[in-house]
Amino acid sequence: MKNYSSILIIYNPSAMKGKINEFIPKIKQRLLLRFSQVDAMYSANTNGAENLAFKFASKYDVVVSCGGDGTLHEVVNGVMKSGANPVIGVLPCGNCNDVAMSLGIPKKLDKAIDCLLRMNTTNYDIMFDGKEYITYSIATGYLVKSTYSATEKSKQKFGRFAYFISALKCLFKLESIPVTITCDGTRYHNKIAYLMFLNGENAGGFKLVKDADVGNGKVKFVMIKRTNAFINFLTFIKMFMFGVKSIRKHKSVIIREVQNFEIENHANASFILDGEKIKFLKKSVQVLEGVTIIKK
């Protein structure tokens, strides 16, 4: 067993509606059961977690992201840009914790800490667009619009099913997004209802890819072509209830595993990258052998 002696927790002070600050002393105390040095630092502003990870990654054996997928995105970017190679840990304390779910890390804090104490690790691939590292997903389309249209109030009240409610509201506003996608040399020029590149099992809190291999050098590519609005909606419901395998035979659906891809966004549509809304016209992405990460 490798001797890990130092661990840094980088946490979002807004996590758990601000209550994470009360739990940090308890987290540190439990981690002292295994690590001789346990430190915690909070991200004070946008990109704060990335800056902390970049500055301190080389000084710790383990760097832990404590927050949601957005905090993890920053921590991974800071670590990758630093050139250091600490093990990455995750304490899922945010609104969206897709990566932690894919790794089997429990939402309950005590059990998530148990994972850090066990130090059971796996290789985890990272996508890279030449400037920024993408931890687990990039997506666009109708389903994405319904994701960021879901209000915080509805998410608190209905949980992940808030996205279904939002999707119903967006049903008759379905956009037809013209894109050109090149995947490992194969070119697709289509008007789409949905597009996703995913490393892992979960997106939006739903298990879409069962038993996904997060370290095989490839990511899952899913494209749903724009057809009839109602048919597209039924395809969406089926995918989010039963996973992408359930729609693989649909004529409007393309599913592949890819190593490199390029997206040409002809309509300047909004994308969701690791849970954050962005816009771009063109993006070339490669899948890299990324980090060592703690799993269940």
For each feature predicted by the language model, list its residue ranges:
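Short, well-ordered alpha-helix to beta-strand connector turns
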Residues: 4, 35, 60, 191-192, ...
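ATP/nucleoside-binding phosphotransfer catalytic cores, i.e., glycine-rich phosphate-binding loops
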Residues: 183, 189, 213, 223-296
